[in-house]
Amino acid sequence: FMFTNSQIKADETYILTINKKNYFVFTDTISTAGFETSQDITKEYQINTIPDNPVVLPDILYDLAKWELQPQFEDSLRGLIEMLQVNPNITIELGSHTDNRDSHESNDILSQKRAQSVCDYLVIRGIDPYRLKAKGYGERVPRTLHKDYRYKDYVITAGTELTEDYINSLPKEVQEYAHQLNRRTEFKVISKDYVPRENISDDQM
């Protein structure tokens, strides 16, 4: 896209928004403040596709058998909050997973509470609760790694599925690391056509 000097004025700040179907909305700020002469501004952007598969949220860890979101991990959700703010028509599922220790029932309950704790935090930060779905998967969906992970001198390679049998085949000190990789919270886009409630007319309600 190109904007001419009849559209861009001196000493102004502009917000550029890029929308494309099946891509996350991208925004940038461009300022002409301080420009003394007319000049060209060239910007190149790479926009991200909305993934079909769940995205693991980094650095969200829990104490053993606990579900409260620890304050030191709240920064990990900042990028997700910004994404939801810029993309108001997206709804997401927050799915939480446990390792395979403890009973199936206990893991289902624990993972649901962990997923809900993340949803609750997002709501506190101003995200519409109708855009969020908490889902606990317990231990039923072992993680498949999309990159190599290293623990000391041991490498768990990309493509590995962290099943119970696989983890039990690892050296003892690596097993705990693999269990930690399985304990995770992910987000998945489940719809792209949500209408914010303030934009719903009386006839639609």
Set out the residue ranges of the language-model regions.
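Periplasmic OmpA-like peptidoglycan-binding domain that tethers envelope proteins to the cell wall
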Residues: 97-205
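Periplasmic peptidoglycan-binding/tethering modules of Gram-negative envelope proteins
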Residues: 1-91, 130, 176, 180, ...
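Conserved phosphate/oxyanion-binding catalytic-loop motifs
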Residues: 94
